């Protein structure tokens, strides 16, 4: 969903 997902999952969906 953006940079937040990148921090959580490490992908950045």
Swiss-Prot record:
Compartment(s): Secreted
Keywords: Secreted
Protein name: Fletcherin
Expression by tissue: Expressed by the skin dorsal glands.
GO CC terms in record: extracellular region
Lineage top rank: taxon: Eukaryota
Organism: Limnodynastes fletcheri
């Amino acid at each position: 969903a953006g940079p937040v997902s990148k921090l959580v999952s490490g992908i950045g969906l």
